[in-house]
């Protein structure tokens, strides 16, 4: 999966993002647009991804929320999916 990344962060942040993206690729249907990664002003890493339908976006968000919880528990880095329907 191709991803656009535009942020600077610690090695831990990059590792957390890599883990999140690996799970995103394996657990949910492929987004219809290239996901974009941005660092929010709040320090959260957002992965914006467009899906074909609201239902697919909702399901992807639910699945990846579990991954986000595991990652933040292990690393104190919050990476979240910001899904939307295209």
What are these regions (language model features)?
Residues 22-33, 71-76:
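Short secondary-structure junctions
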Residues 16-22:
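Acidic-basic catalytic patches of nuclease active cores, encompassing PD-(D/E)XK
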Residues 1-15:
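N-terminal presequence-like segments and adjacent domain-start helices
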Residues 58-74:
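An amphipathic, aromatic/His-enriched active-site/gating alpha helix that lines ligand/cofactor pockets
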Residues 26-46:
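Short edge beta-strands and adjacent turn/loop segments
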Residues 69-86:
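A short amphipathic beta-strand at an alpha->beta junction
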Residues 45-62:
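A short interface-forming secondary-structure element
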């Amino acid at each position: 999966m191709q991803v656009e990344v535009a942020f600077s962060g610690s090695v831990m942040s990059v590792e957390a993002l890599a883990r999140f993206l690996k799970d995103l690729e394996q657990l949910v249907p492929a987004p219809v647009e290239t996901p974009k990664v941005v660092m929010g002003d709040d320090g959260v890493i957002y992965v914006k991804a467009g899906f074909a339908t609201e239902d697919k976006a909702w399901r992807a968000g639910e699945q990846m929320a579990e991954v986000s919880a595991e990652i933040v528990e292990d690393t104190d880095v919050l990476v979240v999916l910001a899904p939307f329907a295209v």
